[in-house]
UniProtKB/Swiss-Prot annotation:
Free-text function comment from the UniProt entry: Transcriptional regulator.
Pfam families from the UniProt entry: NikR_C, RHH_1
Family: Belongs to the transcriptional regulatory CopG/NikR family.
Entries under SUPFAM superfamilies matching the protein: ACT-like, Ribbon-helix-helix
GO biological process: response to nickel cation
Keyword Transcription regulation: yes
Annotated CDD domains: RHH_NikR_HicB-like
Binding site for Ni(2+): 80, 91, 93, 99
Residue pairs linked by disulfide bridges in the UniProt entry: none
Protein name: Putative nickel-responsive regulator
UniProt xrefs under InterPro entries: Acetolactate_synth/TF_NikR_C, ACT-like_dom_sf, Arc_rbn_hlx_hlx, CopG, CopG/NikR_regulator, Ni_resp_reg_NikR, Ribbon_hlx_hlx, TF_NikR_Ni-bd_C
Keywords on record: DNA-binding, Metal-binding, Nickel, Transcription, Transcription regulation
């Protein structure tokens, strides 16, 4: 971030400022400015996800029972059918029965959401969560 930083002021009601300061401490930020910068970036990412013209990224985290009949094959088939969107995946053995997989996906928001629902809805998937992101050049 080699851009010039510009200082400006913000007026807030006292209760809202207390909430802000509480979050700065809770999340370990070094200053209010750091928290506000992250909140603005989050807003930009949300807006990109609301647009169908932007390429965005997502990380799908799933936990599943690898003993579930045909589940692994179905997940691999889905990923291979969408190889243009799937950047990579990481597989971790949690215990004898359960695996955790993260799948990094790129594409239009609707493509990523559809793919996440398709994988997350398979029988044997115990947990599925899509974390939304995008390139933020700020």
């Amino acid at each position: 971030m080699g851009e010039k930083t510009i200082r400006f002021s913000v007026s807030l009601p006292e209760d809202l400022l207390k909430e802000l300061d509480s979050r700065v401490i809770k999340k370990g930020y070094s200053s209010r400015s750091e928290l506000i910068r992250d909140l603005i970036r989050e807003l930009i990412i949300e807006e990109k996800w609301d647009s169908e013209t932007e390429e965005v990224f997502g990380v799908l985290t799933i936990i599943y029972d690898h003993h579930q009949r045909d589940l692994t094959r179905k997940m691999i088939d889905i990923q291979h059918s969408k190889y243009v969107n799937i950047l990579c995946s990481t597989h971790v053995h949690l215990d004898h029965n359960n695996c955790l997989e993260t799948i990094i996906i790129k594409g239009k928001p609707s493509e990523i959401e559809k793919l996440s629902i398709e994988i997350g809805g398979l029988k044997g998937v115990k947990f599925s969560k899509l974390t939304k992101s995008s390139k933020v050049e700020l």
